[in-house]
Amino acid sequence: MTQTAKKSPFSMNVDLMHGPIFKNLLLFMLPIFISSLFQQLYNTVDTMIVGNVLGDTALAAIGSCGSIYELLVGFGLGIGNGLAIVAARSYGAQDHDLLKKTVAGSLVIGLVASLCITLAGVLGLHPLLLMLDTPAEILDDAYRYILTIDLGVLVMFAYNLCAGLLRAIGNSVMPLVFLLISSGLNVVLDLLFIARMGMGVQGAAVATVISQGVSVVLCILYIILRVKILLPEKKHFRVGSHLYWELFSQSISMGLMSSIVSAGSVVLQYGINGLGTLVIAGHTAARKLFSFTSMPVMAMASACSTFVSQNCGANQPERVRKGMKEIALYSVAVAVLAVLLMQLGAEWMVQLISGSNEPVVLENGARYLRWNAPFYAVLGVLLATRYALQSLGQKVLPLFSSVIELVGKVVFVLFFIPKFAYNAVILCEPIIWCFMAAYLVLVYLHDPFVFPKKAE
């Protein structure tokens, strides 16, 4: 008998393979959006408390190593997303024995990968901060912060893998519930470690790791007690070489894609670090706000990954085509709302996040937000198409979009930032997004599953 996920009053599995496409995508996406909101709140609460309690220098310390954090964690998160894609395909094909083998193989690959990432960070973080020309007055704080985050990569990866597996079977609600609980804990620990115990920026990192650890424990307990379909037995760990290769290649493809994107951020951070502490502080606050305001398109792209994976497993290319069109229209609507929001309150939001009254901080942060907002439509199409191609099993071609981004950022750092300063930083990503989106859409339109060639 086919085993199914056990229902509970606290769970909600959205059927992405049947029914109205956009409505079901929204139902599935909304918990992911709220989860992303509170996940981002981890770092933003750190930023607000650090900025208001410890000042601009401490805020710049966290901002100066933000791109390194993305590089370390991004690879692990990419691996988790790649593993969840294979699980969603198995679920879409209704092969639940294969699904359990996929979970077992994912645990093995994920553990090894996260330990390797942690070791690489321990060995290379300080030299990398020096290479990025991090200002001397913030170097020690930046190193303590990012080293603590690096030591907690396994915890962060474990949550994202568990949450990804639940979403692979259509359950995006329970990861949200656990994250809401841990987010409240994160705020309490931030205030305790930074404001009361005087642990400085390192206290913010410790609070983030501990609170995410709580969400991991809750997620694992839920899977054990309620979602037996994701609970492999001893026999399922005898994963065949073909499945291991599929898991490895899919996860490495996603991981490399995330790493190349993050490497581009590291390169760009090098250019920003040379513009001074106040510019770094303004950019840090603006990037935090960008992470919030772009979240609707990023959450939809994440939902698109599960949607395409399941329908690929169920052999429904027509449904994939319709879904991608509706996601593109949704991205345009988000961009319009973002433009209105930035015109009304960009400076106020930058001041709220940074706790600063410095004109340089507020002006640069506000300009970054206003100039980027119209391009959210391009970003939405870019992200959804990239996730869709990965979900369709294309492991190489989507990587080239990340290479385009990396090369573009190198060009801006070498030639444009020295001449145009922060204006070049602001325009860098929107211009690159346009090139990446054009390339990815072209690849998508030639995908043999979504657009099969008609027999002559």
Where are these regions (language model features)?
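Small-residue-rich hydrophobic transmembrane alpha-helices
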Residues: 59-119, 156-175, 282-346, 379-393, ...
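Helix-terminus/linker motif at the lipid-water interface of multi-pass membrane proteins
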Residues: 37, 41-60, 129-136, 192-199, ...
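Interfacial/gating helices of multi-pass transporter permease domains
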Residues: 50-70, 136-141, 201-204, 243-250, ...
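Transmembrane helical elements of multi-pass membrane transporters/channels
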Residues: 27-46, 148, 159, 182, ...
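Transmembrane alpha-helix boundary and packing residues in multipass membrane permease domains
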Residues: 32, 36, 48, 85, ...
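Short runs within selected transmembrane alpha-helices of multi-pass transporters and secretion channels
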Residues: 80, 149-167, 175-186, 204-217, ...
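Short alpha-helical transmembrane segments in multi-pass integral membrane proteins
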Residues: 1-29, 87-154, 196-252, 308-375, ...
